[in-house]
């Protein structure tokens, strides 16, 4: 369904079961029966969400179920003045301040992991033949690296992920560049719709409370599994509407926004070429 305005671009999900946002525990129970962390179940289970904030929240919730001890890796951060002759911000850019800076695709200053955690690799590592967004499971910790097992390859491999260097501009002005040396991993019990592309997963909970906000988001999310019985959606109560169909198991149905670029549906007609 393609809508032409905010009132008509909603798509119903008539054949999917759902959890509402006040039933988070029920959603987790569906993913992990008895709310017990199961490393094998975690391999084939994922939560998809539209925002990094929602992803971080879900990741923390699931990781807290893992009974293993955690290890914290802190980055080595330095900053360089790039082109600011006035030197306005230099006085306030102490380590405590710039270690709080984060950017998408770059690991945070402090990372906390546990053995059996599911993660994504944030950068391609050609020397290890690892591509960006490869799913891995943590096996063992070392001082400056983490041993992992690859998951989405025909044959799993055991490799050590080292610290690598990231560079990005600071948000308080393009005059400063932060250099961060950190392990290129991020928890992946949950991931954004975009990050899930190319992933095939057995069991998926799709968090639609944030609504898709880009073309193709909904398609990517709902095409990660082969059987709709292994999909549940997580929605706000105001996203439920009466179906108008009697005799259905659910009298209400969740609706989400369908985003389609105008360029995709735009039709150009050459009137001069019409006889």
Question: Where are each of the predicted segments found?
Answer:
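RecA-like helicase/translocase P-loop NTPase motor core
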Residues: 1-275
